[in-house]
Amino acid sequence: MSPGSGVKSEYMKRYQEPRWEEYGPCYRELLHYRLGRRLLEQAHAPWLWDDWGPAGSSEDSASSESSGAGGPAPRCAPPSPPPPVEPATQEEAERRARGAPEEQDAEAGDAEAEDAEDAALPALPVKDVEDKPEQQTRTRETDKSPTSTEPRQQPSALFARGNRKAVKSPQRSSSKIKENKHPFALYGWGEKQTDTGSQKTHNVCASAPVHEIHESALRAKNRRQVEKRKLVAQRQRAHSVDVEKNRKMKASSSENPWMTEYMRCYSARA
């Protein structure tokens, strides 16, 4: 329906004569409210909802009217004062202050008790004390001269044989650890400290003497060397066979005058 047409809708019939005296105050109130809200949003001031209430709503309406009239943007409510310290927290602080010297006295008593226990332990016999430096000197000599002569290597080999029983115990403990291990990697397993000292590795270094290498590692080393030699021999044989085959093919092709290039390249008789 165009405005020029004679037909009027219900809206046009109802509001054809707007009465400004009735709707003017409502329009001004809504206009001032929108202006105040726009100024408040554009000011980027933090809004504190603690003072929200009937009194706050009346103040908000008053501030919106003043801002709509051209006043400055409404200020945010003042921050609330800090809450008073409760007496319970004061009592806890006093207890902690009192408990600090008592804990120090208890720690001193524990240290004295540990010293008394250490003094009460029986002293080691003289023989054990004398044997330890001898073992240390032996280990130092073996470490200093890894590439020594054969007669010097024999006592170190005997010493290693005598300590085989001592080597077996960490292997048993490692087997127990493997038995107790979970079949799947659990979450957070990397944070746990694992005992890697009892797990013996048999990596063979090129500079390591024979008497210091584990027997299984020596067997593996020899087996790998034998396999390498076999592979080298097989490659040499294959290369020699290929060379002989090519030489025979060239000789036969040159000797036969009826062999064409196609027959030489693509025939099965070649």
Curated annotation (Swiss-Prot):
Main location: cytoplasm
Location of the region described as Disordered in the Swiss-Prot/TrEMBL record: 50-201, 231-255
Biased composition (Polar residues): 145-156
Gene Ontology MF terms in the entry: microtubule binding
Bias (Acidic residues) ranges: 102-118
Composition bias, Low complexity: 53-67
Modification type N-acetylmethionine: residues: 1
Annotated motif ST]-E-Y-X(3)-Y motif 1, positions: 9-15
Localisation: Cytoplasm, Cytoskeleton, Microtubule organizing center, Centrosome, Centriole; Cytoplasm, Cytoskeleton, Spindle; Cytoplasm, Cytoskeleton; Cytoplasm, Cytoskeleton, Cilium basal body
GO terms for cellular component: axon; axoneme; centriole; centrosome; ciliary basal body; ciliary transition zone; cilium; mitotic spindle
InterPro entries: CSAP
Known role: Plays a role in microtubule (MT) stabilization and this stabilization involves the maintenance of NUMA1 at the spindle poles. Colocalizes with polyglutamylated MTs to promote MT stabilization and regulate bipolar spindle formation in mitosis. Binding of CCSAP to centrosomes and the spindle around centrosomes during mitosis inhibits MT depolymerization, thereby stabilizing the mitotic spindle. May play a role in embryonic development. May be required for proper cilia beating.
Subunit structure: Associates with microtubules; the association occurs on polyglutamylated tubulin.
Protein name (Swiss-Prot/TrEMBL): Centriole, cilia and spindle-associated protein
Lineage: Eukaryota, Metazoa, Chordata, Craniata, Vertebrata
Name of the gene this protein is made from: CCSAP
